[in-house]
Curated annotation (Swiss-Prot):
A motif (Q motif) lies at residues 6-34. Residues 37-208 form the Helicase ATP-binding domain. Residues 564-581 have a biased composition (Basic and acidic residues). It is an enzyme of class 3 (hydrolase). This is ATP-dependent RNA helicase DeaD. It comes from Buchnera aphidicola subsp. Schizaphis graminum (strain Sg).
């Protein structure tokens, strides 16, 4: 039996798991699933190289579920994921696959959740724990996560954990679990650090490498926009300037289909939602309106859009980025049908850059970034549409009746025809002004814009974070966090927490100066308020960091050095006083680079 001929029922999985797969529409395993499931069922260690979207979550979760002891209420499977989004996604997959197996409890653990909530869940004895390295390490240090019954460990997207600076935490966790256990490591690439982990912690792993064969059609023009501000406002801007016959907008949830549809309706767009709550009759009626041209905009979830085939769709908008690359390919494949050219736009939030890179790797193509259309373009498009409507009215046959009505309203002596036409033009523009004086949607000049970062793993920064190059002073802000050496905090903890909880690329984190009770961190200018609110609540080793912006970098630098000198010499105040002027002078002459050198003092 070859992999391509096999079905899940022939792999020897639990019948209840097969039932879940059948209900979810899974019939034939993907190449990574067909290769990994038999090995993991046998208890072998597996080293898998596969892209996101290849089905690797099912490749490890299905066999591990099969071998689980449902009568033992203790963590038996531990999955490490680089981000909270992936941790939640993997946890949901475990829950979906075990839907018909009674007594299985899955728990995601990640930063941002209250410890009290997680502690209550841990006391219930989950058999499967999925979490981010930082939060898992916190629980291990607190003694609230007992891994003595663990039989399987999974590292999902190991290269991403390396890139985000979590690899030391990963190694610490792996060194604290029982020696007798099964390990599965999945990575899109295999840098030397990941290879080293596999040699150190895995037992004769079977290496599986799956080449992606997912492609997109060349007649579909793809681009992405880095989200800032309100997504609905930006969506309307793109719709206004784009020429399209019909468009489908993909969102993650059923509620989002309704929310986006209502926002578009308020702005004068004829749109409809398509989700799983619709009965078949209403679904068919909506699709018929789309096909006939009575409806131009459809907002749908991936599940609801299955089987949708409408030739007149020329524009696909990924309002919410899909979690896997294959879904992206299926989405944009809805456009460019019947020999027509298609257009696909992807909205990407800062915390979703990882998903964008996964999509690009999968389709073996770089997706170009586009900017939000400027008001000059918007005004031009509005004026063109307005002029077209006016021309249509000029060609109508009943204008004489309205000319007579105009004579009753105003006499030629009252005002000239141009002034009257201008007043009517202003009235007719409605809620979409033809003259826009200020663009409220453009990115503020201070706001930090993450650049295209498509360098592969061989170009990653040196793992010795003390040697990180310093960014120009004008491009960064200084922040103080209330956690330091006395709290057991190290530089790597700070990098990992900010990268994960703030979804900031670790390359964009500047130098860090660690003190006894606090630390000073360089971060890019213009961080959003929402991002800072998330960071304020972030904890490092169970201590809230309460991050604060330091406004005056230069003055703070001098104050910090003076304080440091004073602390070192506090037992000899007189000598400090005698030499104070000399030392202050030397401090002022000291270069900024020495202050920002990343090391403990």
């Amino acid at each position: 039996m070859t992999h391509t001929e096999s079905t899940f029922s022939f792999l020897g999985l639990n019948p209840f798991i097969i039932k879940s797969l059948s209900k979810m529409g899974y019939v034939k395993p993907s190449p990574i699933q067909a290769a990994c499931i038999p090995l993991l069922l046998e208890g072998r260690d597996v080293l898998g190289m596969a892209q996101t979207g290849s089905g690797k979550t099912a490749a490890f979760s299905l066999p591990l579920l099969h071998n689980l002891n449902i009568n033992l209420k203790a963590p038996q499977i531990l999955v490490l994921a680089p981000t909270r989004e992936l941790a939640v996604q993997v946890a949901e997959a475990f829950s979906d696959f075990s839907k018909y197996i009674m007594g299985i409890h899955v728990l995601p653990l990640y930063g941002g959740q209250r410890y009290e909530v997680q502690l209550r869940a841990l006391r219930q004895g989950p058999q499967i724990v999925v979490g981010t390295p930082g939060r898992l390490l916190d629980h291990l240090k607190r003694g609230t996560l007992n891994l003595s019954n663990l039989y399987a460990l999974v590292l999902d997207e190991a290269d991403e954990m390396l890139r985000m600076g979590f690899i030391e935490d990963v190694e610490t966790i792996m060194s604290q679990i029982p020696k007798e256990h099964q390990t599965a490591l999945f990575s899109a690439t295999m840098p030397e650090a990941i290879r080293r982990i596999s040699k150190r912690f895995m037992k004769n792993p079977q290496e599986i490498k799956i080449q992606s064969n997912i492609t997109t059609r060349p007649d579909i023009k793809q681009s992405y926009w880095m989200v800032y501000g309100r997504k609905t406002d930006a969506l309307i801007r793109f719709l206004e300037v784009e020429d399209f016959s019909a468009t489908i907008i993909f969102v993650k949830t059923k509620n989002a289909t309704l929310e986006v549809s209502e926002a578009l309706e308020r702005n004068g767009y004829n749109s409809a939602a398509l989700n799983g709550d619709m009965n078949q009759a209403l679904r068919e009626q909506t699709l018929e309106r789309l096909k006939s041209g009575r409806l131009d905009i459809l907002i749908a979830t991936d599940v609801a859009a299955r089987g949708l085939d409408v030739d007149r769709i020329s524009f696909v908008i990924n309002y919410d980025i899909p979690m896997d690359s294959e879904s992206y390919v299926h989405r944009i494949g809805r456009t460019g049908r019947a020999g027509r050219a298609g257009r696909a736009l992807l909205f990407v939030e800062n915390r979703e850059r990882r998903l964008l890179r996964n999509i690009e790797r999968t389709i073996n193509q770089t997706i170009p970034e586009v900017q939000l259309p400027k008001i000059e373009v918007l005004c031009k498009r509005r004026l063109e549409r307005f002029a077209k409507k006016v021309q249509e009215q000029l060609e109508s046959r009943d204008l004489d009746e309205y000319s007579a009505l105009l004579d009753k309203l105003y006499s030629p002596d009252d005002l000239d025809i141009k002034t009257l036409a201008s007043a009517l033009l202003k009235m007719a523009q409605g809620g979409r002004p033809l003259i826009i004086k200020k663009d409220l949607l453009q990115r503020p000049s201070r706001e930090f814009s993450f650049k295209d970062d498509r360098r592969r793993e061989d170009n990653h920064r040196n793992n010795n974070r003390n040697r990180r190059e310093r960014r120009e002073l004008k491009d960064i802000d200084l922040y103080r966090i209330e956690a330091g050496r006395n709290d057991g905090v190290e530089v790597r903890h700070i990098v990992g927490a900010i990268a994960n909880e703030g979804n900031i690329n670790s390359r964009n984190i500047g130098n860090i100066k660690l003190f006894s009770s606090y630390a000073i961190v360089e971060l890019p200018k213009g961080l959003s308020k929402d991002l800072l609110q998330r960071l304020i609540k972030t904890k490092i080793l169970n201590k809230k960091i309460n991050i604060k912006l330091l406004r005056d970098i230069k003055n703070y630098e001098t104050r910090t050095h003076n304080r440091s000198i004073f602390n070192k010499d506090k037992n000899n105040k007189r000598r400090f006083s005698d030499n104070r002027l000399n030392k202050s002078s030397s401090i002022k002459n000291e270069t900024k680079s020495s202050f920002f050198r990343r090391k403990s003092v």
